[in-house]
Amino acid sequence: MGWIPCPCWGTNDDENAGEVADRDPVLLVSGIGGSILHSKKKNSKSEIRVWVRIFLANLAFKQSLWSLYNPKTGYTEPLDDNIEVLVPDDDHGLYAIDILDPSWFVKLCHLTEVYHFHDMIEMLVGCGYKKGTTLFGYGYDFRQSNRIDLLILGLKKKLETAYKRSGGRKVTIISHSMGGLMVSCFMYLHPEAFSKYVNKWITIATPFQGAPGCINDSILTGVQFVEGLESFFFVSRWTMHQLLVECPSIYEMMANPDFKWKKQPEIRVWRKKSENDVDTSVELESFGLIESIDLFNDALKNNELSYGGNKIALPFNFAILDWAAKTREILNKAQLPDGVSFYNIYGVSLNTPFDVCYGTETSPIDDLSEICQTMPEYTYVDGDGTVPAESAAAAQFKAVASVGVSGSHRGLLRDERVFELIQQWLGVEPKKAKRKHLRTHKVVDSG
């Protein structure tokens, strides 16, 4: 595939420079899969969008995003040493988290699955927020660890920018999904900066204690980011799997073993047992949070990918697991500084994967490596379809408000009830509503 220049719609011009902010700025922070990613060859200025894209998705993804974890640095790095992965910062960081595939086809068909923060950005602009003065975005390389310097220092820089551009006003962070975990890591690692720059933190659909069903299955079989007809054009489940096995961020969203779950998450496998070549039986085996590690190891022992004519082994990565365990320690210890208000929105009313089962009684698993080519059966709990409500509601921070909203994991970003809550907590309302209110008020006064 050729390397095609990727024009970015939106700029970082200073059209609002010099304006006096009339409100505290808002910084939108995306979650996993919620940022546009570009790649380019080193010593080249030409970039190609590799996430998200509908057309040629699999090819671009394999070429640029398949990676290997480097235990010496803590980063996951492209298989091709000549490739760099970048996050566009156009439109004050908003471009990368707005419409994740801003191609004409997506806009023409209005594929809402990739309209990420778009509706929320429009809502905030409609309430009087101005890009570059009181509204900013932070997209990042979501393959990386939530506590890695690249991400944490990037967030710090974006907070500093919002603080300065608004005339020294403290920032309201609105984070989605895994973005809430990164904010938690930042809060622990840079408490003074968090206190200096942040006034409020609104988090949406954050897997504070992990997302057991979805993450366990992602490690074993992958994930389908887009469902339905569009998935035919998109990154395949298995192509995605071969990336996620080497992503620290995925391991950091495994179920928290220190959390007191109502019921411990499990992985179940219907196993074929053979005492000799003739007698066989079928048993349902269960693996808890600790035992699942051995299951991951056995299931992924033969996992590999082909890249550039070479076979590359991709077993379960214990170096990433060790790194993720230290991240979990940070997440468990993080504390909200005095003077910062915390608000939590989490999804409810949707069947959400919790326990995962592979094989059936009539079609059992012989060798555990077969799991990776098996579609799972789930046991469901209440949640947003991705994160259990039990996890998303279990922030360890004292909340001004914690509200369950009926909606899907990504759908919450365009949910009217969520918008109402955000407007209430920010103390704003749409301009049209204000004008209507003022006109009514004048009529009353004139009487």
From Swiss-Prot:
Swiss-Prot/TrEMBL GO biological process terms: lipid catabolic process
Superkingdom, natural source: Eukaryota
Keyword line: Endoplasmic reticulum, Hydrolase, Lipid degradation, Lipid metabolism, Membrane, Microsome
Catalytic activity, reaction form: a 1,2-diacyl-sn-glycero-3-phosphocholine + H2O = a 2-acyl-sn-glycero-3-phosphocholine + a fatty acid + H(+)
Temperature-activity profile: Optimum temperature is 60 to 65 degrees Celsius.
Keyword Endoplasmic reticulum found: yes
Membrane topology, record value: Peripheral membrane protein
Enzyme Commission code(s) on record: 3.1.1.32
Compartments, record wording: Microsome membrane
Catalytic site: 177, 384, 409
UniProt-recorded Gene Ontology molecular function terms: O-acyltransferase activity; phospholipase A1 activity
pH dependence: Optimum pH is 6.0-6.5.
UniProt entry tagged with the keyword Endoplasmic reticulum: yes
Coiled coil: none
One GO term describing the cellular component: membrane
Role this protein plays: Hydrolyzes the sn-1 acylester bond of phospholipids. Phosphatidylcholine, phosphatidylethanolamine and phosphatidic acid can be used as substrates. Weak activity with lysophosphatidylcholine and no activity with tripalmitoylglycerol and cholesteryl oleate. Seems to have a preference for unsaturated fatty acids at the sn-1 position.
Family: Belongs to the AB hydrolase superfamily. Lipase family.
Note: Unaffected by calcium.
Protein name per its UniProtKB record: Phospholipase A(1) LCAT3
Species for this entry: Arabidopsis thaliana (Mouse-ear cress)
Taxonomic lineage: Eukaryota, Viridiplantae, Streptophyta, Embryophyta, Tracheophyta
